[in-house]
Amino acid sequence: MTGHEIRQRFLDFFAERGHRVVRSSSLVPANDPTLLFTNAGMNQFKDVFLGQEKRDYVRAASSQKCVRAGGKHNDLENVGYTRRHHTFFEMLGNFSFGDYFKADAIAYAWDLITKDYGLPKEKLYVTVFREDDEAEELWQKVTGIPKSRIFRLDEKDNFWQMGETGPCGPCSEIHYDLGIEAAEPGREHEQFPDDAGGRFVEIWNLVFMQYDRDQSGKLNPLPRPSIDTGMGLERIAAILQGKITNYDTDLIYPIIEHAAEIFGVTPGADTRTDTVLRIVADHARATEFLIHDGVVPSNEGRGYVLRKIMRRALRNVRMIGIEDPFLYKLTGFVGELMKGPYPELLESIQRVARVTKDEEHRYATTFLVAERVFNDAIKSIQGNTIPGALSFKLYDTYGLALDEQEDMAREHGLAIDRESFDTEMEQQRERARASWKGAEKAAVTPAYQKLVEQGRTKFLGYSELEAASRVVGLIVDKESVQQVPAGAKAELVLDQTPFYAESGGQVGDHGILYSAAGEKVADVETAFPGVPGLTVHRIAALAPIAVGDTLRAEVAVPLRDATRRNHTATHLLHASLRTVLGKHVKQAGSIVDPGRLRFDFTHYAGLDHAELEEVERLMNQEILRNTAVQTDILPLEQAIATGAMALFGEKYGDQVRVVSVPGFSRELCGGTHVQRTGDIGVAKIVYEGSISAGVRRIEAITGEAALRQYQETSGAVKRVADMVKVSEPALIEHIEKMIANERALEKQVEQLKNKLAQAAVGSLDAEARTIKGVKVVAAHLDGMDRAQMRALADSLRNKWKSAVVVLASVEDGNVAIISAVTKDLTAKVHAGKLASSLAQAVGGKGGGRPDMAEAGGKDPSCLDEALTAVYADVESKL
């Protein structure tokens, strides 16, 4: 059976038994911001198991794409060196949500592998949790497997739990005996269950989710036990196709063959090349699927893990002498190979190839330096261990990742002292923590903590822009005070406030505080969260203020309006970018203030003019629709389920605020927004550029600022058109002609200068003096630039064979000097020193090689005298 047939037979088997076949979810978890990558089939059903989500089916089956290359489940360093470790793999699974339980799960698994897949029963072994008598009995009763092939293992191997508390339960694993010929060298004598992954291969894990572990650790029976199973497609394919290693299956080996063809090598020729081919094949699969699902190489989070995977492949290929880009060719091949079960891959093949090739070029420029430093460093090592301090320096200073170092060390028969490396790493973390804590203490005063303990600030600003409030705290120089005089700079805390405290990229509000009598008592310069739940107002007092005073807090409406226009426009920008560029676009940072919006996002290349125009058009189209902006307070799970975008790594409470432009944008957001998109007026992109690898930045303006920009641009276009006496529609064509004419004239000037330079050869030949058999010329040639003088000096050297040439020109009061010496004379006359000496005479400096040098100066008054002196200087040296 082919790999695709094995996958399809699995899904069909369970569909025939009442299971809903559910498509694989993305490798980027949609409902779990705490999870780096989807790493198991049950991830997309997590909330169903937890009882937080209801679906219209109680049985499911899937073939889930998974990545394990970071965090708890990290197989990266083993990939390529073992038979069955992968970064990317597919997990076949069947699930029961309170429907069938152990007996049916065991029966289904046994029927599929022995009847549909045809595995011989006598080669199958089973493990159960040491206390799970029920499972052991069911295995014998349902399948007939003898007790001698059922083994009880401890909690580490055969008990599964989702977390410290919550659903958990015992599990059973099915293993297959590949035969003694599959045993790893030296392990032929091992018997099940001692042989871990050599002769005996785990193929299917059945989790019996029957308990709920509480805070005390007690296991309480679940009212509706569930089933979660997982079988690696690559593993079962290897068994059914008679292969010892997963890499020889038709799911992966075609990639190995294609890579070998690109590299000009033969699979099986030598161990090292085979290891590299396995690494490349696996990492090409991971790269293709991760980039397709929206991950972009970067220096943090998921992007960092992807970069590690890609660079591990690139570095290993360099070790067999291949330096040209190749990975982008393999990702396209993977897309074609996997298009049957994943037809959506065809839509992104070009994008994935482009991202991959860009990363390959970026790597080529950075790795060479790090590799050279590593190779130089290990020359001084005594013994077989690289000291942790040296390894940490390579990591910290030169960016050579530890896993890359370990692979490189392995090639030299060396190992890294991980313990001392970890010590160095922890010391750096402690330094960082100490620095952070010091900064934190400087910013967060004890006064804030005391105030928030007395009561949190009530925020009224979503619906109110002014409010009567009571002063509950005043802080000056980090100390609480009871009152402040007029003219004081202070921090003020109110019991309730309409002022938005800076967060989520949106700046804090400005405004005014009034006394009960209507007197203006303070300017509010900004508001910020001193600690969570406490809004601190930074003020300039205009009159005395005391704790307990009742004030009227009034937000500066024009500034708030401008800010919320920009904030809603940021959401429109984000949605438009995802429409134009693809769903891989994710927010990487933002700033929203009254004057502009700045939005950082993940993308692999700069936007061209057409893309920027389309993004801007979509934003303004939605503004013209004047859609009502909706805000809802929802449970986090419900908000995510409705498609609201959440930022990876952000911590959200149980209840979240969802801001929606129906049919266009939906995000989790705590900021302030317009009531209708039409309130934005107009949006204009004013900047697009790169801020780091894989991260772009756009700046835009809205409302009156955008209108002014359009007016200024229109006015400038009209003035230019008037200056050149053409209509505005004809302006671009006219300017293009002007530029073409200018370039033609510049070319003519260059040609004339070259002719003058060639003509100068003859005059300088006549002007040159012969000193001790050497041609020497020192000439003042105005009208020539440095490049022309350099070319002229070369011509004279080539013509004269043995010569010293010094040329100078003056332009705009600045002196340019070129000195050239033929190779036979450099031991006596140094061109760099000659130029330096001449430069000093004209108030400048310079120097260069013994045979060619440049210099300059700012005092041309002494130039001719200095040139005359060159002859005597050269004569003294010959």
Curated annotation (Swiss-Prot):
GO CC annotations, alphabetized: cytosol
UniProt-annotated stretches for the region Disordered: 841-860
A Pfam family annotated for this UniProt entry: tRNA_SAD
Cofactor binding remark: Binds 1 zinc ion per subunit.
Binding site for Zn(2+): 567, 571, 669, 673
GO MF term set: alanine-tRNA ligase activity; aminoacyl-tRNA deacylase activity; ATP binding; tRNA binding; zinc ion binding
Record InterPro entries: aa-tRNA-synth_II/BPL/LPL, Ala-tRNA-lgiase_IIc, Ala-tRNA-ligase_IIc_anticod-bd, Ala-tRNA-synth_IIc_core, Ala-tRNA-synth_IIc_N, Ala-tRNA_ligase, Ala_tRNA_ligase_euk/bac, DHHA1_dom
Main location: cytoplasm
Cofactor(s) listed in the protein's UniProt record: Zn(2+)
Entry EC no(s): 6.1.1.7
Localization, UniProt: Cytoplasm
Functional description taken from the UniProt entry: Catalyzes the attachment of alanine to tRNA(Ala) in a two-step reaction: alanine is first activated by ATP to form Ala-AMP and then transferred to the acceptor end of tRNA(Ala). Also edits incorrectly charged Ser-tRNA(Ala) and Gly-tRNA(Ala) via its editing domain.
PANTHER family for this protein: ALANINE--TRNA LIGASE, CYTOPLASMIC, ALANYL-TRNA SYNTHETASE
Domain topic, free-text comment: Consists of three domains; the N-terminal catalytic domain, the editing domain and the C-terminal C-Ala domain. The editing domain removes incorrectly charged amino acids, while the C-Ala domain, along with tRNA(Ala), serves as a bridge to cooperatively bring together the editing and aminoacylation centers thus stimulating deacylation of misacylated tRNAs.
Protein name in UniProt: Alanine--tRNA ligase
Source organism of this protein record: Solibacter usitatus (strain Ellin6076)
Classification of source organism: Bacteria, Pseudomonadati, Acidobacteriota, Terriglobia, Bryobacterales
Gene name of this polypeptide: alaS
